[in-house]
Amino acid sequence: MSDESATFRAHAQVLSGAVLVVAVGELDLVGAPRLLAALPDQGTTPVVLDLASVGFMDSSGLRSLLEARQACIDAGRPFALSRPSEQVLRVLELVDLSSEFEVVERPVS
């Protein structure tokens, strides 16, 4: 793990009828719980996860994306990725899961 992992952050904001969660840093064993903690736990507003600034993702990060998606499905709220980085796309394609995630444009304020 690099120093960037220790500075992973994710924050949520409401934009255009969706909750936008912006993730920055390495989505790994340290970052994955931080990502999940940033997700809203109530409501039915769609969740859009902006991954443009994720420079690395390992299996822990992949698991957090799957957990976030499932939590949204269970709550009846739409879930989508926005601007996934090359590194994120590479992992999703490697494990043949890219088609499991809807990819949308980033909501605007």
Model region roles, listed by residue range:
Residues 1-56, 66-109:
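STAS-like cytosolic regulatory interaction modules
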